[in-house]
Amino acid sequence: MGKEKIHINIVVIGHVDSGKSTTTGHLIYKCGGIDKRTIEKFEKEAQEMGKGSFKYAWVLDKLKAERERGITIDIALWKFETAKYYVTIIDAPGHRDFIKNMITGTSQADCAVLIVAAGTGEFEAGISKNGQTREHALLAFTLGVKQLIVGVNKMDSSEPPYSEARYEEIKKEVSSYIKKIGYNPAAVAFVPISGWHGDNMLEPSTNMPWFKGWKVERKEGNADGKTLIDALDAILPPARPTDKALRLPLQDVYKIGGIGTVPVGRVETGVLKPGTVVVFAPANITTEVKSVEMHHEALQEAVPGDNVGFNVKNVSVKELRRGYVAGDSKANPPKGAADFTAQVIVLNHPGQIANGYTPVLDCHTAHIACKFAEIKEKVDRRSGKTTEENPKFIKSGDAAIVNLVPSKPLCVEAFQEFPPLGRFAVRDMRQTVAVGVIKAVNFKDASGGKVTKAAEKATKGKK
């Protein structure tokens, strides 16, 4: 077998008709985890429904429908392989909770793949003021997705088909606006593709002899290639933050007969080992970890990205809940936040947001109402410079520095230090009205929580 390939996560973004589904479907179909049986079943259904041309999007629509109905599909279906990586598509827009998922997402995307359509008028619609292309790209950048690949799709339907001039025009335009957002176009691979016909997806296209390949320049090393799959292969591998302090937001807490209380969650930073004396913030409960398991196997250590269950002593299920964060009680432990300051970007709020506004914040696994106590300043989204002090209100399109006060105990961190615990979605009226990145946290004093017998014993034993 040799060494297993590195796992990376991508998010696919772009306007609604850019062909994201077809492109993604094509990759999953050709290099992915969909078994032959499933494909034959889908193809047969497609034939019967007169969708005989069997668009790859059909695969994705089927998967998406199942995902939305809450059927947990075998996650392998959202995976495919390149020469170097196992790639997981963590979400594709069009999914109702895409923005929220991207922010609270169980995982940070290592790279965003932006799909734009080359058809006449299509590209212009996507990139126009109300197109989703800009918003998705801005979101990706704001949320710390530093790598980008651009697929110029539907090259088969440009005027004339496979037009070099059209490709160059789009490349120039996209370069200029991703630069405004904060990406460096020289480090972005641009690939002219047809997700439907397969041009430059896995094999160099014979329809575009003018395309000599893509090149990227970056301090970590330059790269070049011909196809979209090459570009995915050239993504820089993520550095998983094992050297940081432990942060593990709880997704669930189970009571398991004969074992006891088992919190479950994903290690975001640091390392969790049996014997660690953990503290759960914001409740400030301290206890010892007896064992750590993943996929029913005992682990000697869990690292960032691992979804684990761990058994804790002398703590009842009632004392822990989703949204709490586990950390090492002896190494920069997590604490509850009294209040925090964040840069907030308002995406789509029908009215105005003023001091006192109290929506629900989704941050990591926590879901808690927070009050906009003070809107301190309006800032320019790109440069971060102040444009207005103490504004009366903010509205869609604005970015602002805001002081927020949680209505119940909440554990969050500065984005700089712990990115997964430092970005949030602002939800109101069943939609994401804003996104935020936490600049600074004013922590509560962490004295006076429960310390279990197991924790005391473990601590004594180590002296």
Curated annotation (Swiss-Prot):
Example GO molecular function: translation elongation factor activity
Keyword GTP-binding: yes
Residues carrying 5-glutamyl glycerylphosphorylethanolamine: E301, E374
Keyword tags: Cytoplasm, Elongation factor, GTP-binding, Nucleotide-binding, Phosphoprotein, Protein biosynthesis
Residue ranges of the region described as G4: 153-156
Positions of the UniProt region annotated as G3: 91-94
Region (G2): 70-74
Subcellular localization, as worded in the UniProt entry: Cytoplasm
tr-type G domain segment(s): 5-242
Region annotation (G5) ranges: 194-196
Superkingdom field: Eukaryota
SUPFAM superfamilies: EF-Tu/eEF-1alpha/eIF2-gamma C-terminal domain (SSF50465), P-loop containing nucleoside triphosphate hydrolases (SSF52540), Translation proteins (SSF50447)
Gene Ontology terms: cellular component: cytoplasm
Region feature (G1): 14-21
Any one GO biological process: translational elongation
Pfam annotation, one family: GTP-eEF1A_C
Amino acids binding GTP: 14-21, 91-95, 153-156
Similarity-based family: Belongs to the TRAFAC class translation factor GTPase superfamily. Classic translation factor GTPase family. EF-Tu/EF-1A subfamily.
Function comment: This protein promotes the GTP-dependent binding of aminoacyl-tRNA to the A-site of ribosomes during protein biosynthesis.
Protein name (database record): Elongation factor 1-alpha 1
